[in-house]
């Protein structure tokens, strides 16, 4: 069963479909290899087939779905090589962001990050994976913005769904508490302005969940 969020004010039908489908693909409510039922999804989303098909074409270009003429449309399987490319890009950028954070972040910036981390405990206790995932995304987005690199974040975010699926799957084989501890260690290194430790911890944090998800 897919989850459908409310349509935003002034959001086009295509953008709405795109956002909802990406969210459900990332969170594996639409599973890898699953066939999309166009008439049913159009009815659930309250849109006509034209914007739905426009969204499908964009998802196909982003390699999140596969359109098979006269057969159907399927959620793409996880492509290990593509995930590794995205992981490598993120690792390079985010290790540099972690190093920059040691230099640039103010006490107020660091407090914002600690506020994010503080919420993890509640959602870990409730085993709410999607909330934890949102906090994880929010933590990294904050770091990019605080370091003055929002364009870097946009670059990564465009490719993120491929990597994000492995992050969600990693929660099934790696306790969320471990990822929480990664964030605590990274934030402590940033707070202490330890560039070497922050760089190293960021690389480990990005690499381990992907490896576990792909071998599970």
Predicted regions and their residues:
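Short helix-capping and inter-helix turn/linker motifs at the boundaries of alpha-helical repeat units
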Residues: 12, 110-111, 174-178
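Short, flexible turn/loop "capping" segments at secondary-structure junctions
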Residues: 66-68, 136, 178-180
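Conserved amphipathic alpha-helical segments that form helical-bundle/coiled-coil interaction surfaces
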Residues: 86, 104-168, 181-189, 197-203
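Single conserved hydrophobic/aromatic residue that forms the stacking wall/gate
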Residues: 204-208, 212-216
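Short linear motifs at protein or domain termini
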Residues: 1-103, 207
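Signal-transduction coiled-coil helices of two-component systems
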Residues: 59, 120-123, 213
């Amino acid at each position: 069963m897919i989850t459908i969020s409310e349509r935003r004010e002034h959001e086009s039908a295509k953008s709405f479909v795109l956002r909802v489908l990406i969210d459900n693909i990332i969170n594996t409510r639409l599973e890898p290899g699953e066939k999309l039922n166009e008439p049913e999804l159009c009815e659930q989303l309250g849109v006509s087939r034209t914007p739905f098909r426009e969204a499908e074409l964009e998802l196909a270009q982003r390699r999140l779905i596969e359109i098979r003429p006269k057969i159907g449309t399927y959620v793409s399987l996880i492509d290990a090589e593509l995930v590794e490319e995205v992981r490598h890009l993120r690792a390079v950028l985010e290790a540099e962001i972690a190093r920059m954070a040691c230099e640039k972040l103010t006490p107020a910036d660091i407090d914002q990050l600690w506020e994010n981390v503080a919420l993890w405990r509640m959602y870990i206790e409730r085993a709410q994976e999607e909330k934890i995932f949102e906090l994880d995304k929010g933590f990294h987005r904050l770091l990019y913005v605080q370091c003055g690199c929002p364009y870097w974040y946009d670059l990564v975010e465009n490719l993120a769904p491929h990597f994000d699926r492995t992050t969600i799957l990693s929660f099934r084989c790696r306790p969320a508490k471990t990822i929480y501890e990664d964030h605590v260690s990274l934030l402590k290194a940033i707070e202490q302005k330890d560039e070497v430790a922050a760089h190293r911890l960021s690389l480990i944090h990005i690499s381990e969940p992907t490896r576990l998800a792909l071998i599970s």
